[in-house]
Amino acid sequence: MSEKYKELEKSNNELIKDKNEKEIKAEKLMKKYEKVKQERDSMGDLLVARRLYNEYLEMNTEVKSKFKNILLQKDFESFLSSGYSTSTMDNIWDIVKVEYKNIPSENLEKLREIFKFFIMQMNKKFKDPNFALIEATLEEEFDPVTQFDLSQNSRGKIAEFIFYGYGTLEDKTNSKDEDIIEKIKKRPLVLTK
């Protein structure tokens, strides 16, 4: 009986050792996968950034001149590095707020894309996202607390979404918790009817 017990114990120990080795291999494989995935995502981000930079360069000269000290045009690297700050996002929003009537719709669309891209990229610096884009939905009732009405009606339904707003997110205790905006830094720009 003790002979059989020793064999079973030896077999069990071998299985445990084998299981532990496989867990270590799986963990190493997952780390490699995460690294490759991160590199792939980073390459995708660079391709998107390059496209946005090229589209930015194609904008009207008059529009680009409004952003010349904010989104640097000297080269791709300057453009990219200039976008990774909340002050840049605030400045873009402030200019659009004042100049939206003088910005052609196709350029406004490109600026929205650039703004969204940089907000999303800034989130990648953190384990959990720190910022959220805020949009407005057409035909919903205007909310003066969470939206900025460029038509100065300050009531009625939203007729046009002009530009994103953004806010900071609450810290999460659990990564599966829903994102909750803690503070609105810039409200979405809208026109009401």
Regions found by a protein language model. Name each.
Residues 1-193:
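Extended, amphipathic alpha-helical stalk segments that mediate dimerization
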